[in-house]
């Protein structure tokens, strides 16, 4: 959870996105089918329990515990996958509602119940982060820790953030990660080390250039590349 605006291009910070014409930010574009298909294959299950995912899990939990209000606060975990954080937070006494776009993730979340005997979620529902079926000012905190990097268009990202802000009670907290525009370039040049040849691929470098200029990570067609 970086200590910066979730919308770095907006000098007035996240609250300023509530200004202006509503029609400008209506969520009309569906999430890319490739993204949804991937999650419906269960690719997220177990990711946080291996490799660098272990660091992500531990650090995220640390930051959440530092900043969340005390239980039994109402938390909405939007785009929360199969509920790794949702179930953990519920075990701490929070009233947790889990939402995810992938039906498979919601089904998988039921499997975690066995790891938390006597614990339950208030809800586990399929929905879009830009249209959450809950009343305004009904959550003490919203976790929006997955959806934004799957929504490359600025207006659609704003729609997702506006929806989270709508749900928050006055003084509520919104948690969302930020990914540096240099992430793909750093991934290519450090994770694979000296054997990596991605920076010699035109398609890869075009993708990186777009990330650095527009802040949008748009993968080339699968036939061209695997990244």
Question: Which functions belong to the PLM regions below?
Answer:
Residues 130-142:
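A short acidic, Gly/Pro-enriched loop at the edge of an enzyme's catalytic core
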Residues 24-79, 84, 88, 173-209:
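Conserved class I S-adenosyl-L-methionine
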